[in-house]
Amino acid sequence: LNELMDLLAWTQQRNIHLILDESFVDFSEKSVENTLLKNEVLETYPHLTVIKSISKSYGVPGLRLGIAASSDKEIISYLRKNMAIWNINSFAEFYLQIYSKYNNDYQNACKKFIAERQRFFEVLQQVDFLRVIPSQANYFLCEVTSRFSSTKLVSLLLEHNLLLKDCSTKTGFDGRNY
């Protein structure tokens, strides 16, 4: 969090607008402390916009529900002006009506997930051809270091009904086996 606050101060001094995606912050070990989705932070740093996809946090891909928060009135005005008139579907509206009823269950599930993530990380590290990158999200990025290409490993595991994403063709990975 300290590094993020340093980056935020740096961007503020240079009049740079920072957009921070907190879609996976609920899975971090100290999610309440890690979030910048707080009025005092947003008011202190008007060049900050925090976005969060609810569908990623709650694992509901069709939900199409998210948050954008900023104290920059121009940004908020722009978003409101350019937002579709019907920007929420009935499923998302229903979710908002029942959200608070299940919030404690969700928080408990996140705590269990955090404990399980650590155990899973330790198991993955035992695979001799994987370099596992530590994560605070609900997934791990792994580099396949030998034995298979990432494409081949994804294909082999799919035969056992294990779904992985081959990131070797993604921008920034330069064809490496992730």
Spans of model-derived segments:
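Active-site pre-lysine segment of PLP-dependent enzymes
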Residues: 1-18, 22-57
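Short beta-strand->loop
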Residues: 54, 163-168
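Residue-level detector of structured alpha->beta connecting loops
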Residues: 15, 46, 128-129, 161
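PLP-dependent aminotransferase class I/II
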Residues: 47-133
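PLP-dependent enzyme catalytic core of the Aspartate aminotransferase-like
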Residues: 2, 9, 159-160, 171-178
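Conserved PLP-binding catalytic core of the aspartate aminotransferase-like
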Residues: 113-114, 127-160, 176
